Amino acid sequence: MKTIHVSVVTPDGPVYEDDVEMVSVKAKSGELGILPGHIPLVAPLEISAARLKKGGKTQYIAVSGGFLEVRPDKVTILAQAAERAEDIDVLRAKAAKERAERRLQSQQDDIDFKRAELALKRAMNRLSVAEMK
């Protein structure tokens, strides 16, 4: 089966690099499925799970926003943060979720509320992806 090369990169360095059969991500415009030979595309990503299919198995990566760049032979995910399902520290993610929930319940200005809301989304995404491994 044809494959496409995928790189998931964060400011801290590469998180994943391999050839896969299909990449599925959630862009701001909706779900995208990328196969080898896909037309060039750049899309902003939501906080969500990237699904990488290879050999009948699916690997999951928690992606905290960023951008997707697609070329016919390569997909690059540039994310602020990304973690493979098996690398997620569930206890740390649960603590981050609880911290964000407490910040949301306290009365704060709009900027802090928005930051707490994003922190909660990131923590919930990490927990969701950790369960998929």
UniProtKB/Swiss-Prot annotation:
SUPFAM superfamilies: Epsilon subunit of F1F0-ATP synthase C-terminal domain (SSF46604), Epsilon subunit of F1F0-ATP synthase N-terminal domain (SSF51344). It is a peripheral membrane protein. Gene3D superfamilies: ATP synthase delta/epsilon subunit, C-terminal domain (1.20.5.440), F0F1 ATP synthase delta/epsilon subunit, N-terminal (2.60.15.10). It holds the Pfam family ATP-synt_DE_N. It is found in: Cell membrane. The keyword Nucleotide-binding does not apply. Keywords: ATP synthesis, Cell membrane, CF(1), Hydrogen ion transport, Ion transport, Membrane, Transport. GO terms for molecular function: ATP binding; proton-transporting ATP synthase activity, rotational mechanism. GO terms for cellular component: plasma membrane; proton-transporting ATP synthase complex. CDD domains: F1-ATPase_delta. The keyword Ligase does not apply. F-type ATPases have 2 components, CF(1) - the catalytic core - and CF(0) - the membrane proton channel. CF(1) has five subunits: alpha(3), beta(3), gamma(1), delta(1), epsilon(1). CF(0) has three main subunits: a, b and c. Belongs to the ATPase epsilon chain family. Produces ATP from ADP in the presence of a proton gradient across the membrane. PANTHER family: ATP SYNTHASE DELTA/EPSILON CHAIN, ATP SYNTHASE EPSILON CHAIN, CHLOROPLASTIC. This is ATP synthase epsilon chain.
